[in-house]
Amino acid sequence: DPIIEQARSALSAHYRDELGETFRTVGMCLYRGGQDSVAWHGDRFGRGATHDTMVAIVSIGAPRALLLRPRNGGPSIRHVVGHGDLLVMGGSCQRTWDHCVPKTSASGPRISMQFRTRGVR
């Protein structure tokens, strides 16, 4: 899709100095409503298990909360991600923090586009 490719190219250009590489893949999640959710996890597969990485998330649609908490315990931090927002998880975030999108009583559809570099899942 040309719009997704434009977003990938723009994000790659913006973060190239920090990343040292381009974003290679984009994954998409459709949240049909408030009952669709993602459990606590960290993207620690591939290089993300041992290296600092970056995931750039573009949100389209209804606002949803994204929670972050330290992997070894501690209070969570709540971010509401709205239509057109960009959330970047970089550095050691994937190895040292978990994140989730909890269920909610009121929410419309949302698409989350996650841009990743080579070997990050």
What are these regions (language model features)?
Residues 1-121:
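Non-heme Fe(II) oxygenase metal-center motifs and adjacent flexible, charged/small-residue loops
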